[in-house]
Amino acid sequence: MTKILAVASEVFPLVKTGGLADVVGALPSALKHHGIEMRVMLPVYPAVAASLKQAKPIHHYDDLFGGKVRILAGQAHGLDFLAVEAPHLFDRPGNPYLGPDGKDWPVNWMRFAALSRAAADVGSGRIKAFVPDIVHVHDWQAALAAAYLNFAARPAAKVILTVHNIAFQGHFPASIFASLGLPVEAFAIGGVEYYGGVGFLKGGLQYADAITTVSPSYADEITTPEYGMGLDGLLRARRSVLTGIVNGVDTTVWNPASDDYLALPYVARNFVQRRQANKRAIEQRLGLEEHEGPLFCVVSRLTGQKGMDILVLCLDDLVGQGARLALLGSGEAQLESDFKAAASQYPGRIGVVTGYDEGLSHLLQGGADAILIPSRFEPCGLTQLYGLRYGCVPVVSRVGGLADTIVDANEAALDRESATGIQFAPVDASSLTRAIERATRLYADRKAWNSIQKAGMKTDVSWEKSAARYKQLYQKLLQNR
């Protein structure tokens, strides 16, 4: 059986700030059906410790980045874990990356270098309890493992790096390099050096045996200056080992037929009536008036990348068309303020909940008519996949994974009954306004709208196809050993 060590800074359901956690939490069970054993390595944050009380130590360091560290092996929520217990690094309040003040921990470089170093020690066979064939690292927080493994003294596992969002790169001052424990030759343009500093993601891209990102379109986009965030040149040079594989959805967690967060679960044959009960629950929760027009929802970080500043400019038109908006999200203070102001301006028509609420995110997908996703760039996106599964029609910008996963409701697609949503381009307020107008017109034609919903609900958004693609990639790497 092929053995994989997945390494990430967050894993659902133990700890989650975004879609990365969903992906890393769902992939092991999907791969198990393909005869692949995957264990997941993550840090022991306070939120994680309670779930790993039965874990047993398999390795220890007397001093790793300034303190004692243990690697624990255990199980939780059906997943097999190797957890890096380093109280001096990970036992602190806030989310995995930010302190209570909302700022990055100054020692984040040290925290995630420790995670990467531990992963490399497992991948090199130094820790005998689990010897993987491949170390599959996710994003900059785990990317430095590729550099450590490149310089390992013994034959090491192959390394795959998955980039979930190239905007987050882990760029730190050159002064930290001496503390990383890498040989001096690693601080070079062909190594971890990046614009005079240390780039964790850049080093991972340089040393990984294979690189994946989370959709074919995004794999193409990040090789261009517009989307590559300064790493496009390196990615063009490594294009032959770069693959785009669309994420899947954990269909046991996201299942409208058995979702406890819904007021009334439903299946394809009764979704029209039952989704109305969920819409009423949303209206009551957010103080929205009943109305014959469509109810749009947003479940998103409130940032410029997600196009939320563009949506703010469209709210007058949205309400003017007889539509309503239910928004769940948090992020930039100005955007939170803008949406709250809009809710005050249009009581009963716009409802806003700031923060994150897993249950409400499910209810919005299960009762809103459409979900707005106007991202400036979107590596894959999961909310549009949840929307497909729940019959909440995605209205998306034509970028990255959104372009790959949504079939636009143009005339030909509507005739074929293959349309699953609405795409728009370019990513600006006038295009989004026109997309909202299209959605509102289509919603008035209930036969056409129900056809779009049904086609979306029939779409296979599970991990099955994606897991098969990863299996092919793993096999290809191991053939070249």
Feature-to-residue mapping (PLM):
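Catalytic cores of nucleotide-sugar-dependent glycosyltransferases that transfer UDP/GDP/TDP-activated
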Residues: 1-481
